[in-house]
Regions:
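N-terminal beta-propeller domains
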Residues: 1-66, 178-201
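Structural signature of eukaryotic scaffold interfaces centered on beta-propeller domains
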Residues: 27-41, 152-167
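Small/polar beta-strand repeat architecture
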Residues: 61-166, 175-179, 198-200
């Protein structure tokens, strides 16, 4: 019995390639389905289907929305981020980078809570407040990026009954309990899921 090895047709075997941790899925407590989306050899994505949503991956990373400038982070429990007109909603997942001073938050993912127009609190994936009282004081700079996702009609229980077919930038998705859906990519962070309107003829 061989484990973590690749057997070649001519008889030899070699150690299998390694894997890379890219990101935690949206909901680690429930099943998630990964479906490939390949437009060309240079434009390939991985689609993460979870309960009522899809997230997107490319080039070993999550697809993120545009930069939101951070102008302050409190040393408090919970940590409160100031970012003018950020546009986030409670429960959004964001990645923070490029902060000077409070570097403990850099490169990490947080859930957004306690949203106001210009501020939001940081919690971890379990919804526990991020206590930044022991962090280095915020100095300057920093950006946040929301993890890009779209909503779907597919529940966790339905994910593995999905059938799909792709043509160029369009994927057709079927499930016995739902209308046929068309997933379209028009830009890196512009994906839409719409009902297919069949015409008699």
């Amino acid at each position: 019995t061989l484990e973590n090895l690749v057997v070649y047709p001519h008889g030899a075997a070699a150690r299998r390639p390694g894997s890379t941790f890219v990101a935690e899925v949206a909901d680690s407590d429930n099943k998630t389905r990964l479906i490939p989306f390949e437009f060309s050899t240079t434009q390939t994505y991985m689609l993460e289907f979870s309960n009522l949503k899809i997230r997107f991956y490319k080039d070993n990373g999550s697809i993120l929305e545009g930069d939101k400038t951070i102008t302050g982070i409190t040393q408090a429990n919970p940590a409160v981020v100031t970012s003018t007109s950020h546009g986030y909603s409670n429960g959004d997942e964001v990645v923070i980078t490029a902060v000077v001073g409070m570097t403990q938050v850099n490169g990490k993912r947080f859930l957004v809570a306690g949203v106001t127009t210009n501020t939001f609190q940081l919690t971890d994936k379990d919804g526990t407040n991020v206590n930044s009282t022991g962090y280095t004081a915020y100095g300057s700079a920093g950006i946040s990026n929301k993890v890009y996702e779209i909503t779907t009609p597919y529940t966790t229980a339905q994910l593995f009954d999905i059938k799909f077919a792709q043509s160029a930038d369009v994927m057709y998705i079927t499930h016995p309990s739902h209308e046929v859906e068309k997933l379209s990519r028009t830009a890196h962070t512009t994906w839409t899921l719409t009902d297919v309107d069949f015409t008699n003829g």
